[in-house]
């Protein structure tokens, strides 16, 4: 019962490929008792078999066979661990450029971020270059609503715990995070070794010059966001499982409202069903409040629900598909001009859908929203505008002012983040309700 009492926080761990995200996260989970010695010994054996001895902690999270062989995190791995005062769900997001889509899904579910940066000469520079993913990840996290972060400067053991190098990295990173919009007081910088465990739970003797908090102390200083319990239910679906003996189990994070056992829920397709049971981290629940990642059993065929769909209360403002929507976008990284007819991929909550720029309504000042030009011919890097977007597949989105997590998005093309935006108005499709299929 103790877990119920604790504040719960969702953390996303982000950073460039090979910065040591999975190792740091795995080691932290081990130190906090989230995995036993026997399991770790098995993982160590497996790592040795694959000639990757230094990956034993990473394997705590890298559970897909393909990931263990390549040593890269592909899906967003979810794990739970506890400190004496808090309960955390940790989302280890992929750092590899090809897997940025999965990273966005992970980030959209988090309350706070831990950005892991490798201190090693060349590695920091690689991650922070135009081709590296560190800057992209930090921007995506901010756009997805994460306003508090820890920057863990990792692999300090490889640079002899050099204070000067630490300060040089802090200066570079804090300057960049400030430009994105992060407030200085909401970001902490901590020197660590994810493999050796320096500064994770207790102050390290190898870092006598560092007087700040350890990684776990800094985690416990994160503010727990106010949970929007009173709003209608919204659960963006991350995965759908078909489990023998149970049936269809969609999994997602409750963003607003309360999901209850026995409630009649409706998905964006119009399909409805009663919630037969729900659980989080193998604990059965009667209800789940915002911030909780849950799996719940519904009497629907697995093919009727997909990742990216949204679940709501059938009797209270159920989620609907958007015909089109009006949004403010800021163009960040497009090699040319964005014009009407452009069709990139839109990433919003857990959905990734090709979306067309139907009309460019205006060009505006990014900070103030002041009108610069009506019906512009194009938008280019650094410019902001109001546009009408049309999704090419069924998609549930909401106004940012009503449901923040379902109202902010990232636009991707050519494996890069082209633009970010927030939704101001949604034009809905007229839908008919479909009853749960008979079992």
UniProtKB/Swiss-Prot annotation:
Binding site for GTP: 15-22, 92-96, 154-157
Region: G2, residue numbers: 71-75
Matching InterPro entries: EFTu-like_2, G_TR_CS, GTP-eEF1A_C, P-loop_NTPase, T_Tr_GTP-bd_dom, TRAFAC_GTPase_members, Transl_B-barrel_sf, Transl_elong_EF1A/Init_IF2_C
GO molecular function, one term: GTP binding
Region described as G3: spans on this chain: 92-95
Keywords carried by this UniProt record: Cytoplasm, Elongation factor, GTP-binding, Nucleotide-binding, Protein biosynthesis
Domain of life: Eukaryota
Main location class: cytoplasm
Domain tr-type G: 6-229
Record localization: Cytoplasm
G1, as annotated region: 15-22
Region annotated G5, chain positions: 193-195
Region annotated G4, chain positions: 154-157
Listed GO CC annotations: cytoplasm
Task performed by this protein: This protein promotes the GTP-dependent binding of aminoacyl-tRNA to the A-site of ribosomes during protein biosynthesis.
Family: Belongs to the TRAFAC class translation factor GTPase superfamily. Classic translation factor GTPase family. EF-Tu/EF-1A subfamily.
Protein's name in the database: Elongation factor 1-alpha 2
Record organism: Euplotes crassus
């Amino acid at each position: 019962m103790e877990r119920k009492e604790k504040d719960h926080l969702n953390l996303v761990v982000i950073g460039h490929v090979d910065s040591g995200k999975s190792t740091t996260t795995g080691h932290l989970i081990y130190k906090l008792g989230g995995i036993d010695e026997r399991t770790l010994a098995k993982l160590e054996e497996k790592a040795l078999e694959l000639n990757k001895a230094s990956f034993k902690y990473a394997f705590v999270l890298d559970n897909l066979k393909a990931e263990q062989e390549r040593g890269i995190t592909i899906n967003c791995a979810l794990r739970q661990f506890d400190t004496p005062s808090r309960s955390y769900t940790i989302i280890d997001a992929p750092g590899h450029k090809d897997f940025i889509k999965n990273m966005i899904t992970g980030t959209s579910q988090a309350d706070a971020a831990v950005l892991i940066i490798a201190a090693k000469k060349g590695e920091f520079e690689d991650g922070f270059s135009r081709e590296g993913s560190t800057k992209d990840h930090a921007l995506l996290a901010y756009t997805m609503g994460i306003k508090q972060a820890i920057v863990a400067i990792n692999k300090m053991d490889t640079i002899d715990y050099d204070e000067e190098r630490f300060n040089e990295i802090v200066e570079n990173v804090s300057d960049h995070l400030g430009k994105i919009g992060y407030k200085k007081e909401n970001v902490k910088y901590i020197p660590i070794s994810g493999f050796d465990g320096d500064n994770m739970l207790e102050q390290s003797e190898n870092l006598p010059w560092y007087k700040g908090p350890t990684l776990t102390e800094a985690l416990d200083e994160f503010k727990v966001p106010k949970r929007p319990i009173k709003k209608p239910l919204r659960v963006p679906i991350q995965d759908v499982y078909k489990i023998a003996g149970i049936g269809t189990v969609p999994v997602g994070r409750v963003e607003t409202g309360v999901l209850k056992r026995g409630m009649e829920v409706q998905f964006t397709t119009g399909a409805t069903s009663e919630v037969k049971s729900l659980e989080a981290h193998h604990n059965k629940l009667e209800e789940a409040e915002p911030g909780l990642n849950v799996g719940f059993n519904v009497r629907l065929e697995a093919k009727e629900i997909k990742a990216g769909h949204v679940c709501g209360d059938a009797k209270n403002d159920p989620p609907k598909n958007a015909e089109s929507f009006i949004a403010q976008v800021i163009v960040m990284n497009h090699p040319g001009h964005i014009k009407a007819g452009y069709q990139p991929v839109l990433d919003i909550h857990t959905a990734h859908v090709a979306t067309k720029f139907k009309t460019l309504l205006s060009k505006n000042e990014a900070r103030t929203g002041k009108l610069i030009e009506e019906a512009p011919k194009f938008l280019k890097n650094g410019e902001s505008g109001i546009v009408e977007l049309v999704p090419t597949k069924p998609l549930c989105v909401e106004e940012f002012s009503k449901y923040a997590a379902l109202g902010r998005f990232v636009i991707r093309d050519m494996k890069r983040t082209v633009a970010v935006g927030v939704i101001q108005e949604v034009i809905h499709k007229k839908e008919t309700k479909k009853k749960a299929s008979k079992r």
